[in-house]
Amino acid sequence: MSSTTSTINLSSLGSAINDVLNIIVQYLPVFVTVAVLFGIITYMTGGLGGLFSGITGIFGS
């Protein structure tokens, strides 16, 4: 009885993981595009130092 329950739990866990992986694969191009755009913007604004100084400048003013 207990072995059957654990098997059901494992299979439902596996399908849940499969669903999550499917969602990640679906939205992967979006994440990559956002990451690339953010990287380009960061590079154009003078790297992370420029980004952080820009943020602190906005809050400082």
Curated annotation (Swiss-Prot):
| GO CC annotation | host cell membrane; membrane
Question: What keywords are annotated for this sequence in UniProt?
Answer: Host membrane, Membrane, Transmembrane, Transmembrane helix
Positions of transmembrane segments: 21-41
Q: Spell out which residues lie on the membrane's Extracellular side.
A: 1-20
Q: Which residue ranges are assigned to the Cytoplasmic compartment in the record's topology?
A: 42-61
* Main location, first listed in the record: host cell
Asked if the keyword NADP belongs to this entry, the reply reads no
Localization per Swiss-Prot or TrEMBL: Host membrane
Task: Look up the domain of life of the source.
Answer: Viruses
Q: Per its record, how is this protein called by name?
A: Uncharacterized protein ORF61
Q: Which organism is it from?
A: Acidianus filamentous virus 2 (isolate Italy/Pozzuoli)
